[in-house]
Amino acid sequence: MYTDGGARGNPGPAAVGVLICNEQDEILLEDAELIGETTNNVAEYQALLAGMKRAKDLGATEIACFLDSELVVRQLNGEYKLKNYTLQKLFDEVRKRETNFSGGISYMHLKREEDRIRRADQLVNHALNQALRKAKRL
């Protein structure tokens, strides 16, 4: 599973993108949604949570999560401490949802240039661009 979250303005309008693939790296699901006004780090956590929900809905029992947010990956892998209350609450929600995956869950950082992460980023930007165009028409 590849996820990305982004905010324009940080904080600003934000969206999440989710790309779920099977073991053969075939795309099973692509999705994006607006999540309101927030920061990039909150959007990254929200993207992961959205991906976990969709993976569960698809019947996944084990997932490998690929993110371009080194901060989120290192926090989830216990390498960085959480100092922000909002991120701590999101972190706790991720931990709670991990129990949905009896086969296990892993978190790995990938550079933004990797194809699947780049696609998740495109989904985020497409959702934000559509929202901004719609807002300008109003």
Task: Describe each region flagged by the PLM.
Residues A32-I35, R74-N77, A135:
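A generic short-segment signal for beta-strand/edge and adjacent turn/coil regions
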Residues A43-A47:
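Loop-to-helix element that buttresses phosphate recognition and phosphoryl-transfer chemistry
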Residues L132-L138:
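Extended, charge-rich low-complexity interaction segments
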Residues G6-N10, L49-L123, L128-L132:
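RNase H catalytic domain
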Residues M1-V42, K53-D57, T61:
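RNase H-like nuclease fold core
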